[in-house]
């Protein structure tokens, strides 16, 4: 590894971190900085610690179990003098138990990369590449705009990513794979939004994301929609809370209802419209 690369590994206060240096001698390499967090604050907390210790011109992120392609250094070295604030790359997705098997994970990234490379439309790339990995981010962009990860249990990176994308003066997209994301088969859908507080936390992050884009006239699709649909069957009180706030991310309640029900079954539409009517009537009676 070249000496002009700084690698920061942040341990989220795991109980066996004290033995890491003994078990993994490579952590003592001069370019590598091993940091043990004072608490287990989740990925957003750990990433912010990494930001505080970063010294270089560019930032690249990697999640546990994922990895960069073998010629990663050659790729980033080619673009290190770019005047762009963010450089987006293609990713490859594989299964962790067999990296020769391709996974459909994060397929939406392939689609928005295709859109940009074919049409030059920057908006999907700036607003919907919602993960920190797979891109080179100029550190000055993050510092000048005080961009940080949300220190929440789920979806900590969505607001960071949209801030980076939308506040960048210039972006580039390179038709080259830089990063490989690995996942266990079935892990993405097995119990999504069924853990305690998961729906509330993810919906909150999605709403803040939608609100940012709405305020900047950059809305294309609302991330909150899929969570509101879940709320109808999982958490009516949470649905009531966000129903009252739909005007903050839509031009009107009617536009919101049409968007939420778009593509849904007739049964869902009937139940959702009736429930929405009940909420509206109850609000009128209270006022």
Which residues does each predicted region cover?
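Acidic donor-binding segment of Leloir-type glycosyltransferases
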Residues: 1-36
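Membrane-interface aromatic/basic loop that binds lipid-linked glycans or pyrophosphate carriers
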Residues: 4, 15, 31-32, 239-287
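Conserved short acidic donor-positioning loop in nucleotide-sugar-dependent glycosyltransferases
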Residues: 11-14, 41, 64
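Catalytic metal- and UDP-sugar-binding loop of GT-A-like glycosyltransferases, i.e.
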Residues: 37, 62-64, 174
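Glycine-rich, basic loop-to-helix element that forms the pyrophosphate-binding segment
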Residues: 37-54
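Donor-binding/catalytic cores of nucleotide-activated saccharide
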Residues: 43-48, 64-172, 182-197
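Short aromatic/hydrophobic "clamp" motif used to bind/position activated sugar donors
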Residues: 59
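Catalytic core of nucleotide-sugar-dependent glycosyltransferases
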Residues: 177-185, 191-221, 238-255
């Amino acid at each position: 590894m070249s000496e002009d690369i700084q690698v920061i590994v942040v341990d989220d206060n795991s109980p066996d971190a004290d033995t890491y240096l003994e078990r993994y001698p490579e952590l003592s390499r001069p370019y590598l900085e091993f940091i043990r967090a004072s608490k287990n604050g989740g990925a957003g907390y750990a990433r912010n610690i990494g930001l505080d210790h970063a010294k270089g011109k560019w930032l690249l992120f990697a999640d546990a179990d994922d990895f960069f392609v073998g010629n990663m250094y050659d790729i980033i070295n080619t673009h290190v003098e770019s005047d762009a604030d963010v450089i987006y790359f293609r990713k490859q997705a594989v299964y962790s138990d067999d990296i020769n098997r391709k996974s459909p994970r994060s397929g939406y990234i392939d689609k928005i990369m295709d859109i940009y490379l074919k049409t030059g439309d920057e908006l999907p790339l700036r607003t919907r590449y919602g993960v920190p990995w797979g891109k080179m981010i100029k550190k000055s962009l993050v510092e000048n705009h005080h961009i940080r990860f949300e220190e929440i249990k789920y979806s900590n990176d969505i607001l960071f990513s949209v801030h980076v994308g939308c506040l960048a003066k210039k972006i580039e997209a390179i038709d080259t794979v830089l990063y490989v994301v690995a996942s266990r088969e079935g892990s993405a859908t097995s119990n999504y939004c069924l853990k305690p507080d998961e729906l509330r936390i993810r919906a909150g992050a999605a709403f803040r994301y939608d609100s940012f884009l709405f305020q900047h006239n950059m809305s294309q699709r609302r991330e909150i929609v899929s969570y509101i649909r879940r709320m109808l069957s999982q958490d009516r009180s949470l649905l009531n809370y966000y129903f009252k706030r739909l005007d903050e991310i839509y031009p009107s309640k009617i536009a919101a209802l049409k968007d939420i029900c778009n593509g849904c079954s007739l049964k869902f539409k009937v139940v959702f419209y009736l429930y929405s009517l009940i909420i509206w009537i109850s609000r009128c009676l209270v006022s």
